[in-house]
């Protein structure tokens, strides 16, 4: 019997902990499907080297690994203190100075990177620093100076992040630095570009236009981490290829108690529009220092899988943690365990009824057939990965083997739940010849065996985008050939 494979995908953030020789190979063997390059840290040349190392390691290990470039975005930060940090006490006055000429900070004031902050706040607003560990309440705005009262005791150090409780900051998602970086990551050849702090569909459209101007066809990831993004969720999802539930800054702005419901809402909205969705932030945070996760972390990852996420992401756990490979291994075990316990059939009564595209209709018919006939696998010939994405939205019990000759399409499909990208060149083949070749390839790889039933999808005209319009039910013969090639 062929062993069940993990369906939920794993992203791992690269950093100093993954730079040692051999670590990337171990991460990929442990189950990493996509790596994240965080451009908020390090320089572009260093990230370009990591990208090259990823391509080389993936080839050595023999796996498809995508690369996601995460743009810094307009993260608001306080500036530096003369002594590196200060101790603040509840009731103290502490000013924020929005000026390029702000002096080095002390216990009474510090500069802030966003010069428009005084126009975005009003007396009574609460400002959250260092992920909410330090809270200030605005008392008065005097020109470029914001006078605040400290709400809790604590230590504040250099360059900590700043959020406004409830959102409402007006700065756009794409900074000049982000626009420059899009050109850089286009030259690196990344597969995904993540837009931080997006507010609306226009932010995503602007990023796409810049990427296309550089000849870049990377999939765009919208990071949902602002209150405004929740208000404009549907339009952002529509304008995105991938959606990320970025729980860090989102939790700071809206409050932790709202996060569980919003995570489910974002995942549901993404799946409804046939978009890939990632769940991120502190999923196995304790494994930065511990070789095993906490039980709460295990349940968090498992519940994200049950919610329907395509992928779960590791941040500091792999970038700077003491146990990067163990963190991936733990994530893989948790995902597989959750999938075994909570695999459900598609409710076709609740599925879309006004399909406009042939490939979407074929995807739905394929899933209906796979559930009612009992197939071992779904094999989809695809050019861009669109057919595989539609198929994966139905959360099949059978694995989806997405067959294409395009390297970029395979790496983007590496992020899709239930989808396993396969390299196969169908140029010059008829649909029947392609079916036989793909099935034989999977038999040789140990993914199929004699007697397995397979649903096969393709287009009448091979090598044509969006042309999937054919569905076949096959059975693997004793010699590894596909039998029963009659169209349904």
Model segments located where?
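Non-catalytic helical/linker scaffolds that mediate oligomerization, partner binding
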Residues: 1-488
């Amino acid at each position: 019997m062929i062993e069940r494979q993990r369906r939920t995908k794993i992203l791992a953030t690269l950093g100093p902990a993954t730079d040692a020789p051999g670590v990337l190979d171990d991460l990929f063997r442990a189950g990493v499907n996509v790596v994240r390059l965080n451009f908020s840290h390090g320089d572009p040349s260093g990230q370009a080297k990591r990208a090259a190392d990823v391509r080389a390691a993936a080839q050595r290990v023999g796996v498809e690994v995508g690369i996601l470039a995460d743009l810094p975005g307009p993260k608001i930060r306080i500036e530096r203190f003369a002594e590196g940090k200060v101790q603040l006490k509840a009731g103290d006055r502490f000013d924020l100075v929005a000026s390029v000429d702000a002096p080095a900070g002390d216990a009474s004031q510090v500069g802030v990177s966003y010069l428009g902050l005084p126009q975005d706040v009003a007396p009574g607003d609460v400002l959250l620093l260092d992920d909410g560990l330090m809270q200030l309440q605005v008392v008065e705005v005097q020109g470029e100076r914001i006078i605040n009262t400290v709400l809790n005791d604590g230590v504040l150090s250099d360059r900590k992040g700043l959020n406004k409780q409830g959102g409402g900051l007006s700065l756009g998602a794409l900074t000049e630095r982000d626009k420059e970086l899009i050109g850089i990551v286009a030259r690196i050849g990344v597969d995904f570009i993540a837009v931080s702090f997006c507010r609306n569909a226009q932010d995503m459209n602007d990023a796409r236009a810049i990427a296309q101007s550089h000849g870049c066809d990377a999939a765009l990831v919208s990071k949902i981490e602002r209150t405004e993004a929740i208000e404009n969720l549907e339009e952002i999802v529509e304008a995105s290829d991938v959606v990320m539930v970025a729980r860090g800054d989102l939790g700071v702005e809206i409050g932790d108690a709202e996060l569980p419901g919003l995570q489910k809402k974002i995942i549901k909205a993404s799946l409804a529009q046939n978009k890939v969705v990632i769940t991120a932030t502190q999923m196995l945070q304790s494994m930065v220092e511990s070789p095993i996760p906490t039980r709460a972390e295990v349940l968090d990852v498992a519940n994200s899988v049950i919610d329907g996420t395509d992928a779960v992401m590791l941040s500091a756990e792999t970038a700077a943690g003491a146990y990067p490979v163990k963190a991936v291994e733990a994530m893989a075990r948790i995902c597989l365990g959750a999938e075994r316990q909570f695999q459900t059939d598609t409710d076709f009564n609740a599925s879309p009824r006004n399909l406009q595209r042939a490939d979407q209709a074929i995807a739905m018919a394929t899933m209906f057939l796979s559930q009612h006939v009992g197939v071992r696998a779904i094999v989809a010939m695809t050019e861009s990965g669109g057919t595989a994405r539609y198929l994966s939205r139905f959360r099949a019990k059978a694995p989806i083997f997405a067959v294409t000759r395009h390297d970029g399409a395979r790496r983007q499909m590496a992020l899709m739940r239930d989808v396993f990208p396969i390299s196969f060149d169908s140029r010059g083949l008829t649909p029947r010849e392609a079916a036989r070749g793909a099935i034989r390839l999977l038999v040789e790889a140990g993914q199929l065996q004699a007697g397995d039933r397979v649903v096969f999808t393709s287009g009448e005209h091979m090598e044509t985008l969006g042309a999937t319009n054919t569905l076949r039910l096959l059975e693997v013969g004793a010699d590894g050939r596909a039998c029963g090639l009659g169209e349904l």
